[in-house]
Amino acid sequence: MKGHVLAHAAALVALLLLAGCAGLQPFGREETLGATEPFEMQGRVYARFSDRAFSGSIRWRHTPAADELWLGGPLGQTAAHIVRDASGATLTDAHQQTYRSTNLEASMRDSMGWALPLADLSHYVLGQTPSAVADANVKRNADKRLIALSHDGWEIEFTPAEQPNAGSRPARLRMLKDAIEVRIVIDQLDAT
């Protein structure tokens, strides 16, 4: 019962955090940044899965050859540290348990109960479609900005950023797959 109450409290805190994103910081560069270029992103993440929820921070350092993500819990503690490179992926959870795999999504589900579509997330945070996505699976608004796509079982929804120099980049992502819902609020994204 106590865990159920904590899960609901965490979900409420996450929704309040997501609602307070009106003051997003401007992006470091205009829309010329591509998914193959290095960047650093900071934001907030909320995941709902089964009868549980996670909310906290996300910090991500991306290069074409590697990714490093830190997921922080609501009180600032590290919930997971994820490293991906040519040899595969390593996830270290809050209990210092390490999982190594060539399939990060499966490792995240095994460890945390939810996952991120890391293989294509660099495209999504930039408001771009991965090359493998068919045009029929992509929806754009009147300004030709990406608002939704379907890929690898994930349904991705994009909320456009309102800063003048944001280009096609979204302010928020909502990602759904099976019984998992993940929301990311992008507070800052800079080229490195």
Predicted regions span which residues?
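Sec-dependent bacterial lipoprotein signal peptides
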Residues: 1-23
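Bacterial Sec signal peptide processing site at the extreme N-terminus
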Residues: 15-38
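Charge-rich amphipathic alpha-helical interaction elements
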Residues: 22-23, 44-47, 92, 176, ...
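Post-signal-peptide N-terminal segment of Sec-exported extracytoplasmic proteins
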Residues: 38-79
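Amphipathic hydrophobic-ligand
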Residues: 52-56, 83, 181-183
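An acidic-aromatic
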Residues: 66-117
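Flexible, processing/modification-adjacent segments and terminal tails
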Residues: 95-149
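Gly/Pro-enriched, hydrophobic low-complexity segments
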Residues: 129-192
